[in-house]
């Protein structure tokens, strides 16, 4: 059976955009996106638009609209974020069975790893994001947890026959040991779940004209604030300590941070590793994935994963990062 995205042709993309009143110039450029499909669409006598077509069956309409409302709330509080465009009071549209949203085109550069000045400004931006995010919970979007990101990911991988038989016992053993330790640290660490970005890697924090702005809130969910912070750090432990200090200096100008949450950095890193592999497995019926990730299923990939999980298990037994 053909995957739904195989029917999403350039003509259909143009028809969708024109169905809500825009006149295209027939130019369509596919952008780098796997979970959804994202296109730059040329518009007659105007700037191009970005059209995002949501993966069928992933989110409910309520969950998508809750993401949009969060983005609008951030924008209303002057947090620099790329918000959906609104047409006739709506931000979520449907055409030929596909749900889609339009965004203004907003380019930029990702932050430089370890740049302390940029980390201070990123901290300010994330503090503002979380100041808004902490005011109320999501109602239609799942939270980040050990079960859905960890145990459910392992179940997907074990039941899907993706791991080579030669490495299956080693992967399953270290994964179960790791999840047990992650659960222990989670239970022992006080933390508060807030609305957060959820996938806050440097590529989703773009700089243009010396100002950072937030993009792609597709994975926003409830979770601990530190989830949006740890991926900003790069390098060895000593480098990360200096970077963390700058990040926190900026962050705490706008929102309080509980330093006890720093103990969750390595558990969250472990969950992200497992969830990424499970994400690839769950999307394998989409032809774009075998084409773009041909190494998934290879002994080398899974051997590297076993090593990475073992390293995470060791990291979980080390002293967590602390603020100066």
Segments the model singles out, each with a brief description of its role:
Residues 56, 108, 212, 220-222, ...:
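Activation segment
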Residues 1-86, 209-211, 322-324:
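Conserved NTP-binding catalytic cores of kinases and kinase-like/nucleotidyltransferase enzymes
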Residues 35-51, 84, 180-229:
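Active-site acidic catalytic loop and adjacent metal/ATP-binding pocket
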Residues 43-138:
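ATP-binding pocket architecture of kinase catalytic cores
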Residues 112-169, 191-193, 293:
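A cross-family kinase active-site recognition segment
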Residues 161-162, 278-324:
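ATP/Mg2+ or Mg2+-diphosphate-binding catalytic cores
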Residues 56, 100-113, 154-163, 276-292:
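A glycine-centered beta->alpha junction motif in the catalytic cores
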Residues 225-256, 272-288:
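Active-site activation/catalytic loop segments of kinase-like enzymes and analogous catalytic loops
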